[in-house]
């Protein structure tokens, strides 16, 4: 099964400037264990607290189907989706590939109020609010 990455974006621009990149990990929980979790434990196991923050890319790697989800919010600079070595070193060596989309698909949704340019393989796509690019 192909891995899918969905990034909710205010206006993601692929550029050469380095962005703060944060990666969190969610381990799988057994359904019988989850039945006994209190609210605090449920939030610790399943909520991604930090999705959108200025000039950062925030991702969470979930062991449920090796799904990666997150957000990017360029405010003062372009953001570039780079490979995250932490993904290959800490969780799953099969995803330590030469570049982030080597063996993955990407879905981008513009959650902002304005248009957002996205640069893919040298071609610019301008997304209107609520538009998606796959």
List each model region and its residues:
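Short beta-strand-initiation
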Residues: 54-55, 64, 102-104, 128-130
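A generic structural signal for short, solvent-exposed coil/turn residues
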Residues: 8-11, 51, 59-61, 101, ...
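A short, N-terminal "cap"/entry segment at the start of jelly-roll beta-barrel domains
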Residues: 20-76
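Generic recognition of cysteine residues
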Residues: 13, 29, 111-113
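Glycine- and acidic-residue-biased ligand/ion/polar-headgroup-sensing regions
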Residues: 64-87, 91-122
